[in-house]
């Protein structure tokens, strides 16, 4: 793909998200979501491999179906109220339709089935886009939607997402599918928090974006596809693999890493609103995340046999990317923030 074409498509993807976030009209929101999706489809299909094309087609079909459902819900809302404004009271039937459409777009259970397969068929950089940037607009809409009094529609899907995110990752050996189920679980944490604090949900979303950006870029740098490959790479680039393990533990919410704030914030608001049983179930779901993240760490770092290096170790430099590359800067900054940013996040709770 030519540079000017890819630049135009990326600008269109960003513009679509900005249109959605800044608009109060349901029709303009639908246009922004479709603009972003249609511009992303050629980007996802840039590899032209059969697996890549299959994942691209699945993504397009799911997004087109959810967009049609969203437009039907918006049309029903406009027919009932005579206005396309998102600020008008929402009917319960149209709210269910809109909630399902937004859940499809972010991969929230029980309509999450497409996300692991799509992410498995894409390169890490394209997977980073659909796991982070493409979820910003639907998530913010869902955050706002939960503030309108329809949070009860989102609590059960969020709880199921947390449990499925833990169960689904237990028996996986493919790195992309582990990232996909982890993303599904984190979507549950974000959405359930938005029912009680919009500002806290936005802070958690920023933390989620930073951690996932770091993890995807590190895996893209190491060219790792399976956990067995990660064990092999650990002997070639031990520092990079150590950073991967730290960021994964941060994504699981292990203190004192940055991801702990994401889980602590959600539990704080749930306990403050006397949802003790719900909090306990979500903790159980997150313990499953801890299990397979720690299992990966043990298998990679603690259970390796000693290796006697006979030749020079200069070949390790082949895995080091140029410090002037944009990915290097983005990966470095996001990795530091993913592991050491707790002191920076604590003052933000003043606004919540």
Curated annotation (Swiss-Prot):
Keyword Zinc: no
E.C. designation(s): 7.1.1.2
Keywords, sorted A to Z: Electron transport, Membrane, Mitochondrion, Mitochondrion inner membrane, NAD, Respiratory chain, Translocase, Transmembrane, Transmembrane helix, Transport, Ubiquinone
Source organism per UniProt: Strongylocentrotus purpuratus (Purple sea urchin)
Membrane spanning stretches: 4-24, 26-46, 67-87, 96-116, 124-144, 148-168, 177-197, 198-218, 241-261, 264-284, 290-310, 332-352
Family per record: Belongs to the complex I subunit 2 family.
Taxonomic superkingdom: Eukaryota
Subcellular location field: Mitochondrion inner membrane
InterPro entries given in the database record: Complex_I_Subunit_2 (IPR050175), NADH_DH_su2_C (IPR010933), NADH_UbQ_OxRdtase_chain2 (IPR003917), ND/Mrp_TM (IPR001750)
Membrane topology value: Multi-pass membrane protein
UniProt-recorded name of the protein: NADH-ubiquinone oxidoreductase chain 2
GO CC terms in record: mitochondrial inner membrane; respiratory chain complex I
């Amino acid at each position: 793909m030519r540079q000017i074409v890819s630049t135009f498509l990326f600008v269109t993807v960003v513009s679509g998200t900005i249109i959605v976030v800044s608009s109060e009209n349901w029709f303009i929101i639908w246009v922004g979501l479709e603009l972003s999706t249609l511009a992303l489809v050629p980007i996802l299909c840039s590899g032209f491999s059969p697996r890549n094309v299959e994942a691209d087609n699945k993504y397009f079909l799911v997004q087109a179906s959810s967009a049609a459902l969203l437009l039907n819900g918006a049309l029903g809302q406009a027919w009932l109220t005579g206005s396309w404004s998102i600020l008008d009271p929402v009917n319960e039937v149209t709210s269910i339709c809109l909630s399902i459409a937004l859940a499809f777009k972010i991969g929230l259970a029980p309509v999450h089935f497409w996300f692991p397969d799509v992410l498995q068929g894409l390169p890490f950089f394209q997977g980073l886009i659909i796991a982070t940037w493409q979820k910003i607009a639907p998530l913010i809409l869902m955050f706002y939607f939960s503030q309108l009094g329809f949070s009860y529609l989102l609590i059960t899907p969020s709880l199921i997402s947390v449990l499925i995110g833990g169960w689904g990752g237990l028996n996986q050996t493919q790195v992309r599918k582990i990232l996909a189920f982890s993303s599904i679980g984190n979507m549950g944490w974000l959405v359930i928090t938005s029912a009680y604090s919009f500002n806290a949900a936005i802070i958690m979303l920023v933390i989620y974006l930073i951690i996932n950006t770091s993890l995807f870029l590190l895996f893209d740098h190491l060219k790792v596809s399976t956990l067995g490959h990660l064990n092999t790479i650990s002997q070639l680039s031990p520092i990079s693999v150590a950073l991967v393990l730290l960021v994964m533990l941060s994504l699981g919410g292990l203190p004192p890493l940055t991801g702990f704030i994401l889980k602590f914030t959600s539990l704080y608001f749930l306990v403050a609103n006397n949802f003790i049983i719900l909090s306990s179930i979500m903790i159980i779901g997150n313990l499953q995340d801890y299990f397979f993240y720690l299992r990966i760490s043990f298998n990679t770092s603690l259970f390796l046999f000693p290796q006697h290096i006979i030749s020079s170790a200069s070949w390790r430099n082949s895995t080091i990317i140029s410090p002037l590359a944009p990915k290097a800067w983005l990966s470095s900054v996001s990795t530091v923030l993913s592991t050491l940013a707790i002191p920076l996040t604590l003052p933000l709770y003043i606004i919540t």
